């Protein structure tokens, strides 16, 4: 029965028979799970988002637009993997995208005029060679204002640090190549705290390495009241790990990636769990995935 999504997904999980869906593969299972949901929506003559939702109340999401790439997504750029602009001061989604495009074009122009590279990284953001991580924030603020918009009103800034890629498990330190130094989790949190006071930062994803639970708790106590702290690698869209994160108060928002957990039902369970305690959710694609638009309906 295509209308019984939970039963279908349970059957797929049972058929796979492994904890991490390694037999059939999470991507294969997810493809069947999502295709079934699409078929059921078409059959019932509903929009996909209406078919998925158990509520009649809908909210248009705010886009997070990746405009500067670093880390593993762009060699020789910043240590931080993604610098994003968040268009919050616009009446419609299309207005927000239009404004985001204008800032992107201004960013390209400003980089060119500063003799900085405008080649792009894996995620489509520019990957200039910059002297420091903070200089990327300064460049973003300049791009926003030179486009005729106001920082803090029309646009906010979000970061995906991907700190696990900087972390040395033996020394328990983070290698900031651009800063030419190694820092502790506490020092990294202190850096974020300084930036949050100085720049219109609204969200920091993967600010610390996965499984560094104590440091995540400390970071959340330190800056969690001022900024969204999004856990991706720490919680992996997994309801069990999300429950642990909620209990320990590590983070205050979760990145949701359907192909990280493997079925639509488990994805919706994770979203429901996160929202039940008032945490934020950020729906995300995966690097290198297809152009399928399913996640826009979640």
Pin down the residues of each PLM region.
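Metal- or metallocofactor-binding catalytic centers and their adjacent structured scaffolds
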Residues: 1-42, 46, 97, 125
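Flexible, glycine/charged-enriched surface loops at secondary-structure junctions
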Residues: 2-8, 26, 48-51, 108-125, ...
